[in-house]
Amino acid sequence: MTHIKRKATELHPAARMYARECREGKLNRREFMTRATALGVAAPAAYGLLGLAAPEAKAQTPQMGGTLRIQMDIKAQRDPRTWDWSELANVCRGWLEYLVSYERDGSVQPVLLESWQANDDATVYTLNVRPGVTWNNGDAFTAEHVAHNIERWCDASVEGNSMAGRMSSISEDGKLRDGAIEIVDDLTLRLHLSSPDIAIIVNMTDYPAAVVHPSFTGDDPVANPIGTGPYLPVSHDTGIGAVIERNPDHTWWNEGNGAYLDRIEFVDLGTDPAAWMAAAEGGEVDMTYQTTGDFVDLFEMIGMPATEAITAATLAVRFNQDNAPYDNVNVRRALQMAVDNQLVLELGYNDRGTVAENHHVCPIHPEYADIGATPFDPAEARAMIEAEGLGDHEFELISIDDDWQAATCDSVAAQIRAAGINIRRTILPGATFWNDWLNYPFSSTEWNMRPLGVQVLNLAYRSGVAWNEAGFANAEFDALLDQANGIPDADERREVMAQIQQIMLDEGVLIQPYWRSLYRNARPNVLNAEMHPTFEVRYLEYALS
């Protein structure tokens, strides 16, 4: 494979194509920023391609010091590459950093990488490591350490390692492919992909991609907190809370541009928003992790304004095809047809989002294809269930006891029941639900947004991947997804995505009622804490005024 060396100041040729597509309305601005910056184009240059100036930083100057108290669930920690909830990552962001980050404007920004470049066909990526970064044990951060982490991510033998599915273009037989990484020098390495992969850099922004020290053995990152960031954990109690404090013995590489707070306290108040509200009124918390339903407005009424992020986050009410009767496509499609997604959005999520179409690709994704939705036909749904000999069968829909998720599943079940199909609801406490979320026969799972449509399909529905809670396996789907992963042009990729989305509908993989707008409430003196579209709690950037 020929590697085309490109100066850091040169623009990748695909970036101009994306800019043209954005001007023509084929990509929105956030989609354009994701695509262009993922190829190594700096954010100011990407804005310049659209004839725009990069947004300026806010005028308020953060002050040093203070304690910030954040409402958030605290879950038992484990190897970052096996993290399956954002909250696990958020606790550790103070010392475990990332190679790159996904921003609210859709851009991908360098963190522990200083920059990167892709060759013209996106088969070779040159990664330039940020100079001057040290671990908090004094070791210098090098290209060898980046390579070590990428190799860890590729190891599919580790149960629950979702990163393995994201690294398929540099993997073979469940591990890093020989020759996939070339270490050029202490601060430079190259990735040699087996095929073009438009998502590989963007995948490194996802929360399981936290960068760990080579001495990390895969256990609890809180117990042995070696990292590059400016904070250290003081305590971590599952279901209760966690405390993080600035590390006085470590010089952070980004000194002066963050780490304003002295102390961050995460407070676990359970899943009932009324308890969060009471804690806020009692002066016990300063901001929420996320706020839903009527509580967005209720928090505002007590002086905690909300910020909003328009996202492709969702609730997947999925069937696990490894369990009867959900191994029957006619059963799955019948249950889909019994549900009006618009009504679920209104009743389950207070109409704070947009209607989805049961294929887990969002209109804000650049490759989204408008193929129509599953028809709402309760009578046909009942007839199909009877035709399968299940007229007297009682289905069971399981959800966590979280307010909005329970309300959504209540709405789904009520419509199935109204169609003349027997169904019962089971609501489980968080600690019980999370332990087995992958395996329930019929349940709902909260899914974060990913910037590209192919990302979530690779994570959730490719045959055999760690997070395939639907038990979905389809060779044609996998082959089309491989094809889509390598197509940079949004229009061309959309043609393939139309086929992929149609397979999702034909196979009745899930009931996906809506796309979520996300909200966070915080006291007015909390700076830089706007809701992030992928639920990141970036306390390195937060400050108090």
Show where each model-derived region lies:
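Gly/Pro-rich hinge or "lid" segments in bacterial periplasmic/extracellular proteins
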Residues: 103-107, 196-265, 274, 378-379, ...
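Long beta-strand-rich cores associated with HINT superfamily self-processing modules
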Residues: 520-545
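Extracytoplasmic/peripheral linker and loop segments enriched in polar/acidic and small residues
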Residues: 182, 404, 424-433, 456-524, ...
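N-terminal secretory signal peptides
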Residues: 1-31
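N-terminal lobe/hinge region of extracytoplasmic solute-binding protein
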Residues: 71-120, 151, 226
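Surface-exposed binding/hinge segments that line
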Residues: 163-214, 237
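Structural transition elements
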Residues: 231, 352-387, 403-407
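Ligand-site clamp/hinge motif
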Residues: 216-222, 250-298, 413, 422
